[in-house]
């Protein structure tokens, strides 16, 4: 399949010149462009992506037609219903820890920027939140005193290349409890349920109350029974998404969300007892400190609650660590201008940081707040400019001239690391495709994927802005739910600011 031109192209894009630029000792080919991307189109596609990640029985209005029902017996190994939810990336495992973070970030985007989402886009965003929230609610309430945190055998799954509709690898079930605690995954699940309750409160007040009640219970469990889930969960679920930062950040994050959702001062007292910890320069499914501090800054700046100024100052410290030109910056940028944090799925850090920049800028603007990174003055405009540059890079303003969102723009990745996208749909090829047949017939094939996974944001280019577009390169070619989840809010903000 060759890349197809679509309405997602930058409508105002005019290639003015290609120039060889010297930047920090590197040589880069850059394209100058007038106008801006079609943020509204990118927003709609970034949300549509989640339909391609769905597990369970798909609804009649499913728009991604190359997907079908899958994982319909999930949970049966523990005699519970754990159907639904999302596959985290290009495999067929449901990891509760990153799924909960995905839900929290999607919900935060709806809460902050739902007013900038038009019509069906807002409905689709809420549907994406609810698909995950339904699963997390089942995982949190199916068995008293137990939180289910994963379905599927990661090692067995990764030894196969199968469509989710065909998968015949073990669907093991993993959980945490009082005797096998997991404060990290429990507090993140509480954050997700609380955030979703806010995102869905106007649309379905009764459901919102159910989510919040479950969030309270799961947060109490996280505080009462402390420990890292990767130390207690069997199999390799914890190994794939171990909380390397520990669980104090999730306890802070969960408390911050419950403070907002409930307005109960006991959560304020608890998060104050956790203290203000070390500075950080990234925000991810693992380390939530920066996100918690920005979230608490909302109350400090918008509501004038001076008790949270320490968290606001730490949020500013995070920003100073990622701003180009800041004397305290610890962040590398590629020659083409992309924030670079890791060789593995770097764009997850770009989208999460961009969301925090956009959101903190919103709080600054409302309160007429400014601050300084030593000698560098920082305004809301400063933060928005950096966030927009990162989003534009993802959408094609980069040395490759490639959009890293599948289906957006005239040129985008063709061979993403994704089982379902890389194999013919069940509708097109109903016969079962086995574990090893998938590798020989599809994974190792050199052509484009037969299914365009519209809206999927891949791991992204390397530190030199290079992107090989190879299916086997999961570091750069695999999309993840948490990469997209953080981008949704940014795109909603820019779609509302720059109407095409």
From Swiss-Prot:
Signal peptide (UniProt feature, chain positions): 1-30
A Gene Ontology cellular-component term: extracellular region
Motif Cell attachment site, residue numbers: 471-473
Keyword Transmembrane: no
Cellular compartments annotated: Secreted
InterPro entries registered for this protein in UniProt: 6-hairpin_glycosidase_sf, 6hp_glycosidase-like_sf, Glyco_hydro_9, Glyco_hydro_9_Asp/Glu_AS, Glyco_hydro_9_His_AS
Tissue/organ expression: Expressed in roots and flowers.
GO terms, biological process: cell wall organization; cellulose catabolic process
Main localization (coarse): secreted
SUPFAM superfamilies (alphabetical): Six-hairpin glycosidases
E.C. designation(s): 3.2.1.4
Catalytic residues in the record: 91, 417, 469, 478
Reactions this protein catalyses: Endohydrolysis of (1->4)-beta-D-glucosidic linkages in cellulose, lichenin and cereal beta-D-glucans
Domain of life: Eukaryota
Keywords: Carbohydrate metabolism, Cell wall biogenesis/degradation, Cellulose degradation, Glycoprotein, Glycosidase, Hydrolase, Polysaccharide degradation, Secreted, Signal
Glycosylation sites: 264, 368
GO molecular function: cellulase activity
Family designation: Belongs to the glycosyl hydrolase 9 (cellulase E) family.
Protein name (database record): Endoglucanase 11
Species of provenance: Oryza sativa subsp. japonica
């Amino acid at each position: 399949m060759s890349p197809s031109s679509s309405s997602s192209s930058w409508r105002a894009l005019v290639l003015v010149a290609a120039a060889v630029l010297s930047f920090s000792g590197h040589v880069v080919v850059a394209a100058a462009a007038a106008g801006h991307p079609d943020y509204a189109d990118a927003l709609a596609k970034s949300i549509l992506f989640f339909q391609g990640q769905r597990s369970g029985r798909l609804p009649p209005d499913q728009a991604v037609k190359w997907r079908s029902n899958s994982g319909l017996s999930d949970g049966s190994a523990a005699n519970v219903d754990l159907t639904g939810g999302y596959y985290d990336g290009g495999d067929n495992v449901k990891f509760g820890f990153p799924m909960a973070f995905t839900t929290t970030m999607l919900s935060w985007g709806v809460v902050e920027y739902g007013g900038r989402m038009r019509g069906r886009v807002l409905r689709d965003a809420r549907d994406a939140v609810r698909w995950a929230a339904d699963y997390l609610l089942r995982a949190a309430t199916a068995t008293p005193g137990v939180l289910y945190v994963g379905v599927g055998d990661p090692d067995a799954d990764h030894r196969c290349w199968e469509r989710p509709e065909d998968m015949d690898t073990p669907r093991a079930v993993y959980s945490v409890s009082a005797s096998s605690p997991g404060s990290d995954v429990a507090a993140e699940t509480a954050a997700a349920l609380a955030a979703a309750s806010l995102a869905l409160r106007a649309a379905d007040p009764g459901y919102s109350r159910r989510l919040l009640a479950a969030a309270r219970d799961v947060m109490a469990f996280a505080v009462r029974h402390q420990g890292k889930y990767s130390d207690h969960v069997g199999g390799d679920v914890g190994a794939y998404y171990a909380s390397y930062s520990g669980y104090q950040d999730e306890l802070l994050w969960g408390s911050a969300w419950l403070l907002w959702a409930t307005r109960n001062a006991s959560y304020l007292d608890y998060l104050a007892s956790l203290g203000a910890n070390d500075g950080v320069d990234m925000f991810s499914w693992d380390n939530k400190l920066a996100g918690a501090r920005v979230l608490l800054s909302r109350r400090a700046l918008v509501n004038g609650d001076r008790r949270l100024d320490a968290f606001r100052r730490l949020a500013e410290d995070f920003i100073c660590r990622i701003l180009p030109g800041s004397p305290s910056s610890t962040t590398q940028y590629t020659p083409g201008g992309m924030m670079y944090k890791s060789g593995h799925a770097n764009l997850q850090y770009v989208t999460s940081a961009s969301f925090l920049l956009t959101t903190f800028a919103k709080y600054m603007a409302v309160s007429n707040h400014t601050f300084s990174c030593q000698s560098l003055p920082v305004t809301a405009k400063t933060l928005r400019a950096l966030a927009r540059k990162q989003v534009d890079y993802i959408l094609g303003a980069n040395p490759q001239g490639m959009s890293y969102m599948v289906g957006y723009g005239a040129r985008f990745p063709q061979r993403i690391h994704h089982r379902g996208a890389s194999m013919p749909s069940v509708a097109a090829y109903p016969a079962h495709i086995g574990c090893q047949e998938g590798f020989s017939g599809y994974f190792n094939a050199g052509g484009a994927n037969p299914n365009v996974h519209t809206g999927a944001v891949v791991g992204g280019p390397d530190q030199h802005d290079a992107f090989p577009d190879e299916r086997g390169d999961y570091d750069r070619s695999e999309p993840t739910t948490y990469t997209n989840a953080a981008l949704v809010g940014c795109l909603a903000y820019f779609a509302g600011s720059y109407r095409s």
